A protein has these predicted regions:
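Extracellular interaction modules
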Residues: 1-6
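Extended alpha-helical targeting/anchoring segments
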Residues: 7-190
Length: 190
């Protein structure tokens, strides 16, 4: 079983040298690093419920996407012989990147604070095979179409040292690719 912890979003600038500087700043940012440690710990705890020999395969690998820079770690383990894929799925969901820690209390706070249900956002899409294989991906940075209206959303990890303006900027950075897709679609229509 494998789980990826992706966090710590910095906006890409489209310039190799500037992106390199932003990557160095991201790797040196104490708040972003503390947040990432929390997410890796959550993934380790989640996998340990149904797996043994849980380990971190790679830690804080820099990954570049069209609009953002992420730190990504992968946690894996060997599924226990008595584990069942559905229970394993339930025990690892929702991902810590969307709940925070401690997970149960964080989910209670999200339910109390957020004004509406998250819908597909933060859920997952995937499959459970007849052979017991399970594969899922978190539905973030995704459009949902209802009644001829497109909906999309993003969030940011709030921790003790969070800065409101930086967290809002992180949300906007995450939405950059979706906004660009809308702009391109509008140009095609017009």
């Amino acid at each position: 079983i494998k789980s990826s912890a992706a966090s710590d979003v910095y906006k890409r600038q489209g310039n190799i040298e500037v992106d390199k500087q932003r990557t160095e700043a991201l790797l040196a940012d104490p708040k972003e690093n503390a947040e990432h440690v929390m997410l890796v710990d959550l993934a380790r705890n989640d996998l340990s419920r149904n797996a043994h020999d849980v380990q971190v395969d790679f830690y804080k690998e820099v990954q570049y996407y069209s609009h953002v820079i992420h730190l990504v770690s992968r946690v894996s383990g060997e599924i226990n012989t008595d584990s069942d894929p559905v229970k394993t799925y339930v025990d690892t969901f929702p991902a810590g990147t969307l709940s925070g820690a401690p997970k149960v209390r964080a989910m209670q706070l999200i339910t109390d604070i957020e004004h509406h249900n998250r819908g597909a956002y933060g859920g997952c899409i995937g499959f459970i095979g007849l052979d017991g294989d399970l594969n899922q991906a978190i539905t973030i940075r995704t459009f949902v179409s209802r009644g001829n209206v497109l909906y999309y959303q993003a969030g940011a990890g709030i921790v003790a040292k969070s800065n409101d303006e930086r967290e809002l900027q992180e949300v906007n950075n995450k939405l950059g690719a979706l906004k660009k897709a809308i702009d391109l679609a509008e140009k095609l229509i017009n």
